[in-house]
A protein has these predicted regions:
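Ala/Thr-enriched low-complexity intrinsically disordered regions
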Residues: 4-5
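Conserved N-terminal catalytic core of the sugar/cofactor nucleotidyltransferase
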Residues: 13, 19, 23-36, 42, ...
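Active-site glycine-centered loops adjacent to acidic/histidine catalytic or metal-binding residues
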Residues: 40, 150, 182
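Conserved beta-strand scaffold positions in the cores of enzyme catalytic domains, especially
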Residues: 51, 105, 176-178
Length: 205
């Protein structure tokens, strides 16, 4: 009798746990993912600014973005980092989100290129944004939003893009959007910054 009860308990736990995993996957599948680009070398800053805290409790800039994204309905976060500071990143950033939201790492490496491409001799500088996003191709299968980890956005931005991503028909491909800012609101009085100008044509493209 005791053995039977023991096996029944094991079966119950097995099916319950797998049921919960299935439900979580279904729920998270309906939510967009936030992809944070955090592999920068910080050459001008002089260090890993993505790990430096600036909030009252040591919050980083990306912590504020992640909080706002979660409030806007995002269901997973993925970080693109460099392998050489993985341990430091896990300890300072990733650990705080365990049990709160699914979080994963992927790594940007200079020689991780599509077939047919190679690193030019003498190249040491990391590739740009497109290459960083490509590093997450095997992890992200759902609609996602890309941000830089050292830029400050605001909750409204995540609400707007989160709504767009959540309303995409299942199986949609090549559907894109961008949340823009008025240029004047992005300039600093403490130095020069580079900004891109975006415009729309008569067809709203």
């Amino acid at each position: 009798m005791r053995l039977t009860a023991f096996f029944l308990l094991l079966l119950h736990r097995y099916f319950f746990n797998n049921y919960q995993l299935l439900i979580n996957k279904i729920i998270n599948k309906m939510k967009p993912t936030l992809l944070l680009l955090a592999a920068g070398m910080g050459s001008r800053y002089g260090g890993l600014k993505q790990l430096d805290g600036l909030g009252p409790n040591g919050e980083t800039i990306m912590d504020y973005s992640i909080y706002d994204a979660i409030q806007a309905g995002f269901g997973k976060i993925v970080f693109v980092i460099r392998k050489d500071f993985e341990d430091q990143f896990r300890e300072k950033i990733l650990s705080k989100y365990e049990g709160h939201i699914p979080a994963e790492l992927c790594f940007q490496a200079l020689d991780d290129l599509p077939e047919g491409f190679s690193v030019p001799e003498g190249r040491e500088k990391p590739w740009g944004t497109n290459h960083a996003v490509l590093m997450a191709k095997d992890i992200i299968k759902e609609p996602f939003c890309v941000i830089n980890c050292d830029d400050f956005y605001n909750r409204d931005c995540f609400m707007v893009i989160g709504k767009f991503l959540s309303e995409l028909p299942e199986g949609s491909k090549n559907r894109y959007a961008m949340v823009g800012f008025r240029v004047g609101n992005t300039l600093s009085e403490n130095g020069t910054v580079a900004r891109g100008i975006c415009s729309k044509d008569a067809d709203e493209n």
